[in-house]
Amino acid sequence: MRPGSLAALGGLGLSVSLSLAWPSAAPAQQAAESCVTCHLEMGDDRLAAPVKAFAEDIHAAKGFGCASCHGGDPKEAGMEAMDPAKGYLGKPDRQQVPQLCGRCHSDARFMKRYNPALRVDQVTEYVTSVHGRRLRELGDPKVAVCVSCHPAHAIRPPSDPRSSVHPLKVAETCGSCHADAPYMAPYKIPTDQLQKYKGSVHWKTMAEKGDLSAPTCNDCHGNHGAAPPGISWVGNVCGQCHTVMAELFAKSRHAKVFTQLGAPGCATCHENHEIKEASDEMLGLGEGAVCAACHAAGDKGGKGAADMRALLDGLRGETDKARTILLQAEHAGMEVSQAQFELKGA
């Protein structure tokens, strides 16, 4: 084993010993493997499917073959290729998967040959996640492991629209478990996150406007260290993008009160998955106003919310008047482009 690799994986805490040798540097062009020949010629679609899928896998493109993960001797024909004495592993047990992937992906020197920009702390992060802890501490067979999100034989880079972790695919990938009510029943957590997210301004910005920088599941929950944002830091998560709003909220009276009540800052008013585009209608005590969830017309906060809404409505009315005046002036032949530009920022 290469030095430093066990240290990187030791925190996984799995009582699993893999006899599979570490993959050597992959050749520029992977030699033909008996695995491929047999799996394609046996007439069993179940066995042929992985081979066909792997043809477009990022690992195949880098020169890795079946034996890189499954072990054995691909130069041998027949059953001799699957000799346990030569490190043949076959289909890894679910608990083996993070350690198996981490043999390469946790080794900075090895990964530098193929993608120096790729992080090598994925396994370290995974063991701190809800998924990793349940796998390590409870042996939970249903939690996500590497191949749950990255299909074992069809892994593509996130930039590939066909990838399961392309920004437009992440929500569906997470939802393959988290939107499956029977599958998630033992965990007693909601399963409507995907449905709600697809009604959010974040999803619409990404899917309809094509802005792939809009947040999806992993932007708020993390990739490999996935965890639900806690009450104490959900505002920090939102603040990664909404910096100015986070700073203003932190200085507000609401921030102190929400902390005392144990209420999550941003999500209390904006929800967490079904986040709507902010509008004037959210302010005040009318239908759809979020202030009404806590304030009533008779309390000081309710009066303040109603007054602010009235000011905004008045401003909107004045803005509409100004727009009408400028339109009339333009029709009369006046140059009003600068005024129209400034009015757009109102």
Report the location of each language-model feature.
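Short sequence/structural segments immediately N-terminal
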Residues: W22-G345
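Bacterial N-terminal signal peptides
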Residues: A8-A21
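N-terminal secretory signal peptides that target proteins for export/translocation
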Residues: M1-L6
